Amino acid sequence: MEIEWGFAAALIGALSTFSVWVYLSRRRLYVRTAEIEKALELRTTELESARLQLQRLSTEDPLTAVANHEQFLEFLEREWRRARRDGLPLSLIFVDVDHFRAFNRQFGRKAGDEVLKQVGRCLATVVGRPGDLVARYHRDEFALVLASTDGPGSFKIAEQVRSAIRDLNLPAAKEAPQDFVTASVATSTAVPQRESAWEELDLIKAARHALREARAAGGNRVLRANLGLVGPPELVVTRR
């Protein structure tokens, strides 16, 4: 009888020990699982952050932090198709910093880069609607895409852009006619036809044509393009 009780006690003790071992094993497994899940969550967050960073770098100009040239073209094509579908106007504004080469020669490239950064921030402040885009088009040239904006509306915004850049009060090069950095600004507008492809109406060519005319006239002015490029750009505005 004593042997049976002893065996039972030993068995109970073994079962208790086994239960404790199972509990501790499960506890360790639970803790380890929680650690793995937390590590996976952190890794997923890091990967998503890296993906967003890569996406931003692929669409953003590294100097000015506005959209780059490729993103501008993609955005313009997308907005062109939307405007064609909805029968709405679409406008472009091109901006060129006046006498920028002379500025770089006098003050150095680092100072020139700082001017471009400030101009980029200025443009982003003036054009703040979610459906619009500010991009660096080429060197000292910027481009703005204005969705659902007609000719008079884009011209008004273009004048705001010209004035805002002048009001930055950035010192100009000695050979520039102005004391402060100014910009030549040009606009073009179209209402895409339903039967047309986006390439058929070259808003870029029209706006850049007007931009060349604005530069040739001395800068610090806004011109609105003739979309057919017949005759000179119209609505010249000059501020001296």
Describe each model-derived feature in a short phrase.
Residues 147, 151-162, 176, 190-240:
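Catalytic-core segments of nucleotide cyclases and related cyclic-nucleotide turnover enzymes
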Residues 125-131, 163-177, 211-213:
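Short catalytic/binding micro-motifs of nucleotide second-messenger systems
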Residues 91, 184:
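Cell-envelope/extracellular polymer assembly enzymes that use nucleotide-activated donors
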Residues 133-136:
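A short pre-motif secondary-structure segment
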Residues 55-74, 95-108, 117:
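Conserved nucleotide-binding and Mg2+-coordinating catalytic segments in signaling enzymes
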Residues 1-30:
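Alpha-helical transmembrane segments and their helix-membrane boundary motifs
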Residues 55-56, 69-89, 120-128, 147:
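Short regulatory alpha-helical coupling segments
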Residues 26, 30-33, 37-40, 44, ...:
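Amphipathic, heptad-repeat alpha-helical coiled-coil "signal-transmission/dimerization" linkers
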